[in-house]
Structures are given as C-alpha cells and as structure tokens.
Design a protein with these regions (language model features):
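N-terminal low-complexity, intrinsically disordered segments
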Residues: 56-87
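Hydrophobic, aromatic-enriched interface-forming segments
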Residues: 182, 186-228
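Alpha-helical scaffold segments that mediate packing/assembly in large oligomeric complexes
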Residues: 106-200, 328-334
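Short, catalytically relevant binding-site loops at active-site mouths
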Residues: 141, 219-223, 260-262
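Short, charged/polar N-terminal "headpieces" of proteins
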Residues: 47-52, 199-201
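Glycine-centered small-residue hotspots that permit tight backbone geometry or close packing
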Residues: 74-78, 206, 250-256
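Sequence/fold signature of self-assembling virion shell proteins
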Residues: 2-46, 53, 63-67, 87-93, ...
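Long, contiguous amphipathic alpha-helices that act as assembly "spine/axial" helices in icosahedral shell
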Residues: 59-64, 86-152, 203-218, 254, ...
Length: 334
C-alpha cells in the first residue's frame, strides 16, 4: 500500500506518541471492544433490534399492517370484507461511525498493559454513545414518525426540534402540559401525578402494557426513588439486572442514562435558569435499531510512520417504528 504523506494525517495531536502514552501498551482486542460497547449501551437493549449482518442492501422494509375490526354478523348477509391499505416502515442503513488511534512502535515497546484496556473501553463507549444518541434523536419522531438525526443533544439546544414529538413537562401549576421551548422553569419538577398522566397518554394510544421502559437522566433519579410506588431493583428475583436499571414504578422498569438528551440549554431557555433534559417513556417497538455491521476492529501497520493504525467501526440505521409508543418528559436538570 502506498504511504500516506499528507501532513494532516500525521500530526502530534492525531497520534499516540511516547509522551501521550508513556505508561501503556497498544494491544487492542476486538472482543474487549465489543464487551465495552454492549456494556455502555442503554437505549439499544430497550428497543426493537434487527440484525442485517451478511445481507446486502441499504434499506430494510418492515410491514406495518393496520389493525382490523370485529363486525356484527347478520343472518343471510355476507360478512364484512376488510381491505385495509397496509403500510410499511423503512430503515435506511447509513450511520457509519469509527474510532481510530495511531500508535507508535516506541509505545508498544515501553508501555504497560493497561493501554489496551483503556483504548478498547474508550472505543466501545464512544461507539455505544453514538448509537444511543441517534436513538434519542429518533425520538423527535414520536407522534409524527418524522425525526431529525441532526438535532444536537449537547451544547446549544433550543428545544424546537422536540416540540410536537409527544413531548410534555409537569407544569407546577397545571400538571402535565405539552412542551414548547422557553416554558420549563426550575419548579416544574417530576411528580407522581404527572408520571401517571403520562402513562395514561400511552394507555390511550393503545400501546401494549408489556415491554415498557422509562429512561431518565441522573438528575431525576432521586425524585423517582422518592415516589411511594418505587420498587428497587435490589428486591427483584435472581435474574441478572440490566445495566442502568434501578427499579420500577407502576410496573415500568426505570433506567438511568447520562446520555439522555439535552432538550434546551439554560442559556437558550428565556424563562428558566436550568438545562432541560428529556426522560423517555417508550415501548420496545417505538424505535428500531438495525445493525448491518456490529462493532468491528481492524489494525494496519503503517511502516512509513513505524506505527499501528487501529480502527473500530459500526454500521447501522435507526427509525421511529411505532411513533405512538414513545413519549418524552422534559425535566429541569437540577
């Protein structure tokens, strides 16, 4: 392979040199990356997952039939024919993300074994966070089915992309209220009554009672654990507890994730002084993750730089499959 000679490829900031990794060793194991990736995922295990591994193509078509109805049968009259125009959900596989490091030979000779663990965990976490962020972004399609994967979930967030996406907040005076930007103040905190109202909206949408989950930001954990109906995960049976699971309320499992999106930052919120984050009440079929290539690890020796190029990558797509099965509760991050 021809040597890479561009200055942008090899700069002090783009490589792991002796100074940056003086106490590590560059052994990267693919299975460790996969383990770290799976451990870091929070949203992905709670939504519908499809595997396209080994299959060609870039679009998945999922049939989405319309529910039929029962009709009264009259004597000597033909049955009622139902001819619904069925629809489908399409998932475009176009999310390709990578994590790369260029590791110099001198580091391999002089470093300690913990570098491998650091890089594998870092790669797994970075890729898992990207997948979770995209699933959270797909929540902008709750209600309508039309979502935006470019909406920011950190930094400057105005909140406008989340309006109308089955998004609510608990108004301190009026209870559960549809969210619009510049409305949430520090007093609009989570309440048990507000959560029950949100559950009722999901019930009214004819969403199955099973396979529901509530994914919350860390700031909401204390309020959830203080509700009368909270049941700690410590009191479950001997089954393995999933990552992030802290308990349940009204039979709905509660998961804590630091990846819960920033809906509106404090600077953009003209009426409040705190960031506004989104907690997701979802049914498993509300969102779908399709993986055409799970986490893959590759290495290539770059002789011209006496270094090893390590890359981990993944290829996937996301979609709002049953948009009526997802709701977002905006809470002040206090």
């Amino acid at each position: 392979m021809a040597g890479e000679t561009s200055g942008a490829f090899f700069t002090a900031n783009a490589t792991v040199d002796k100074t940056a990794a003086a106490t590590f060793v560059p052994e990267i194991w693919s299975d460790e990356v996969i383990a770290a990736y799976q451990k870091s995922l929070k949203m992905a295990p709670l939504v519908k997952t499809m595997t396209m591994s080994g299959n060609k193509g870039d679009v998945i078509h999922i049939p989405k039939p319309t529910r039929g109805s029962a009709n009264a049968k009259a004597e000597a009259v033909a049955v009622t024919m139902q001819a619904n125009l069925e629809s489908e959900t399409t998932i475009t596989i176009n999310r390709h993300y990578e994590y790369s490091r260029l590791i110099e030979d001198i580091v391999e000779v002089q470093a300690l074994a913990s570098l491998r663990q650091f890089y594998t965990e870092d790669a797994g976490y970075a890729l898992a966070k990207q997948v979770d962020d995209d699933l959270f972004r797909a929540g902008t399609g709750f209600g309508s089915g039309t979502f935006d994967l470019t909406v920011p979930v950190t930094g400057t967030c105005t909140g406008t992309a989340w309006e109308g996406a089955n998004t609510y907040f608990v108004d301190a005076s009026n209870g559960l209220t549809a969210y619009t930007d510049d409305t949430v103040v520090a007093a609009d905190v989570f309440t048990d009554a507000g959560f029950r109202a949100l559950i009722k909206l999901m019930d009214d949408a004819d969403v199955p009672m099973t396979d529901r989950a509530f994914v919350i930001p860390p700031a909401l954990r204390s309020a959830i654990m203080g509700t009368e109906r909270y049941v700690s995960a410590d009191f479950r049976d001997g089954a393995t507890v999933q990552s992030g699971l802290i308990g349940s309320v009204y039979g709905i499992d509660i998961y804590v994730s630091s990846n819960c999106p920033l809906i509106e930052d404090a600077t953009s919120n003209s009426v409040g002084t705190a960031d506004v984050r989104g907690a997701y009440l979802i049914h498993k079929d509300a969102l779908v993750l399709a993986e055409q290539m799970s986490v893959r690890s590759q290495t290539q020796y770059k002789q011209e730089y006496l270094s090893t190029l390590y890359t981990a990558d993944t290829l996937y797509g996301v979609q709002a499959h049953r948009p009526e099965g997802g709701f977002i509760l905006c809470v002040p991050d206090v």
